[in-house]
Amino acid sequence: SYNIKEMKLIEMDDINRPRVDVWGVSDLDLFKEADNILKNKKDSSKPSFMIIQTAGNHRPYTIPDDNDGFITKSIKKESLTKAGFKSIEQFNAMRLLDHSIGKFFDLAEESSYYENTIFVLFGDHGTADPRAEHMGLEDYELKLRSYNVPLIIFSPKIIQNPQIINRASGLSDLMPTIAGLCKIPYINKTIGRDLLISDNNLAFLVNKKMNPTSYGVID
C-alpha cells in the first residue's frame, strides 16, 4: 500500500474470525468478510477495487468445522491420480474452494453491489502430473501446466454478450482487460493487452520453471 495511498490491506488480525491453519482464516470466512466490507461501503457511488486472495487449496488442506454445510467425499486413489490430484485432502480442499466461491456469490446476489460489479476469478499458477489423463506429457516436461490457469470474468449487467476466448493470454493481460471493461481511459504501458480487442493476438509469457528463465511471444 506504500505506492497507492488509498489502498487498504485487510489482514488476519483485522478479521473477527478464527485462524484455521498457517494460512489464517478459512476462504469461506474471508469471502464473508469481503461481502461485509462491500455491503457497508460508506460511499456506494464511489468506484472501488478489491482483491481477495484465497489459500485453502494449499497444504495442509484444512477443512474448517464452520463450513456452511460442506461435506467431504472419499474416492479411490486411482480416480484421484487420473484427475491430477495427489491426495484426497487436496481433492476436498479444491471442492471446498468451489463451495466457498459459491457461498460468496449467494451473498453477493442479495446485495446492492452485485449488478454493478465485475468479478474476475483467476489462479496464480497451475500444477502438472504426468499420470493425469487430461494432461499431456509435454505439459509436465516443459512445465507448461504451471502457467495454465483458469480465468473467468463475470458481470450480470456490464457483460451483455458472454463469450469464450481461445487466444493465448497471460496474467499480464488482466489489467488492460479490466480497464477496458470499466471504460477507463488509459495509456497501456504494460506488457499485456485487452483480451476483448481481437486485433492483437500476441501474448507475452515468461517461463521461470525452465533454466535459464525463458521469455516468449505466442500468437
Spell out what each predicted region is:
Residues S1-D219:
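Solvent-exposed soluble domains appended to multi-pass membrane proteins
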